């Protein structure tokens, strides 16, 4: 809930300073520091063309949808039709602000991120493929993974490796 309130506060501030009626916002997690210029550009272009952009990554492992309250599997979705939602998640400012205001007025508490909220309120969501290294850094293991990614990129720059 705190994250959503923080996003909403940021959206209200963005609305106050927006100069265009059609302003684009990219909502990004501070715990994803490995974002790159291409992801940002792809998000902006997708919003211009389709009205939204949800950065995703292809699923590499089997996803299990379980029956709530039990240790049983309800179904196994195809990897071909499954993606992991990441950030940034990007929209027209007015659209995402309206969705937040509707969620607040309804007392909605189940939307875990911006794309979940936008889908709940009937907006079409368009996906862009993001890089695998756009990971969340929330555990020591994530930190070491990030460090390895940065070292690999540094070696590419120093030694011209691809």
What do the predicted segments below correspond to?
Residues 30-33, 133:
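Short glycine-rich anion-binding loops that position phosphate/pyrophosphate groups of nucleotides
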Residues 21, 34-128, 162:
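Conserved core of the sugar-phosphate nucleotidyltransferase
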Residues 12, 16, 45, 120, ...:
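Short, well-ordered alpha-helices that flank and scaffold nucleotide-derived cofactor binding pockets
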Residues 5-24:
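Active-site nucleotide-sugar/metal-binding loop of Leloir-type enzymes
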Residues 7-8, 37-40, 140:
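Conserved strand-to-helix beginnings and helix N-cap segments that scaffold or border functional pockets
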Residues 134-162:
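Hydrophobic helical membrane-anchoring modules
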Residues 1-2:
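Conserved small/polar residues in nucleotide/adenosyl-binding loops
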Residues 10, 29, 58, 92, ...:
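Residue-level signal for inorganic ion chemistry
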């Amino acid at each position: 809930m705190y994250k959503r309130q923080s996003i909403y506060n940021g959206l209200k501030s963005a609305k106050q300073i927006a100069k265009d009626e059609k302003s684009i916002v990219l909502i990004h997690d501070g715990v994803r520091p490995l974002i790159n210029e291409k992801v940002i550009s792809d998000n902006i272009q997708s919003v211009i063309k389709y009205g939204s952009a949800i950065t995703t990554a292809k699923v590499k492992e089997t996803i299990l949808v379980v029956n709530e309250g039990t240790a049983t599997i309800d179904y196994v979705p195809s990897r071909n039709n499954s993606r992991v939602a990441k950030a940034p998640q990007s929209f027209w400012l007015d659209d995402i602000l309206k969705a937040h205001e509707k969620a607040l007025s309804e007392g909605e508490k189940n939307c875990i991120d911006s794309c979940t909220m936008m889908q709940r309120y009937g907006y079409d969501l368009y996906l862009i493929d993001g890089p695998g290294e756009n990971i969340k850094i929330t555990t020591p293991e994530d930190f070491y993974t990030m460090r390895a990614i940065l070292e690999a990129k540094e070696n590419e720059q120093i030694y011209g490796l691809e």
